[in-house]
Amino acid sequence: MTTIILYIHVLSLVYWLGGDLGTFLSSRYIVRDELGVEARKTAFSILQECDLGPKLAMPLTLGSGFHLTATYWPNLFVSFAIPMVWLVVLLWLSLVYFQHHSGGNPRIATADLWLRYGVLLLGSFFAFKAWQAGLANWVALKMAVFLSLVGLGIAVRYALKPFALAYVRMVTEGATAETNDAMRHHLAVCRRYVWVIWIGLFVNAALGLRLVNV
């Protein structure tokens, strides 16, 4: 069972990075002035499909990572901690799936956002408590990095709101210098967060492989 969970944990990293890269590259074509609106809409559709991978990978990383941690340090967690966390993961995955296939239902999006806040706050509390109780430094650091990535994901969501407004204006009214500049600017802000997310994933991979000792 542990091997399967580890396999899921590794695949989650692969899909997170791979999907993020596809999202990053396709976003470039949305802001290319020389492309027509239809071509840019196609690029946006590709972006949305690529982005599903990282959105699914984040909760799976949480579930598999916690499962492994609780398996190797069982004395630090209550007996029902693993199924409880997997229930949260299943809820999170459901919200991601239905949000993707509902065309961005605002209620589902809000529920997903609040769940992320809950993961960030409660995860930080329990990770700190586990570290105080004797959790290995490298695992505690991995948890801290992951929770930072959750926070950065929330920041990306807020940064994308003005981009989305400019994109809708482009689709409904046609491309203008104003909408092009707005999309380019807000997408550049999001990319800064994405770069930091990638660095965090590289750091966590190094910690997990024990390439870095802390």
Each language-model region and where it sits:
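Polytopic transmembrane helical bundles with strong interfacial aromatic enrichment
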Residues: M1-V214
